[in-house]
């Protein structure tokens, strides 16, 4: 109320196992779109997850339907294992393997019992992202929002983690927000955002309909432009 729309006409449907890629021009609101699914911003229209209108649910029910992981994740001052399990008795090794972090953890002096966070071993950006993603997969929800989850990963690691992500989320819908586009041909759908407008379709359809997307994709082909 009293403000202007950040974007409009966002329309798409997704089935379990779908990964939806979201990207756009600078400051287009793609991260805001991710947080709309957390109801952190008001919206007009309808957002339904498993038949539930998100705006009508209490926080507990929303938390049971939607998971969110940002590009700068928070780690707890606890062990690697506890950061993943969060009190559950899950097989943490398989989730560390899924995010290609198991070998690095095994090389730590105390393995999965290594303390991380502000009071423990200082992890690199890529390590922290992968540990947080392992936690997200361990406690996956029907809808998972990933906001630039691979921004600190090299190309080869990102490719492998993405391949594993597809296997682990066959019973979920994933919305993956990113400015790195070389994996977007593998997305089930792509949403391009620019000047408050959105266009949804397959990668090939967006390449044909949105010249700026095609320019960015071709510039980044091979993943070299954003590799760290």
Regions found by a protein language model. Name each.
Residues 45-53, 62:
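Conserved ABC transporter NBD signature motif
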Residues 23-25:
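The feature captures the beta-strand-to-loop junction immediately N-terminal to the Walker
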Residues 37-39:
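Helix-to-loop junction immediately C-terminal to a conserved catalytic motif
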Residues 163, 167-170, 185-228:
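C-terminal portion of ABC ATPase nucleotide-binding domains
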Residues 73-115, 140, 156-157, 212-215:
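Conserved "ABC signature" C-loop
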Residues 13-14, 61:
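Conserved hydrophobic segment flanking the Walker A/P-loop of ABC-type ATPase nucleotide-binding domains
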Residues 43, 102-131, 140, 146-149, ...:
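ABC-fold ATPase nucleotide-binding domain signature/coupling loops
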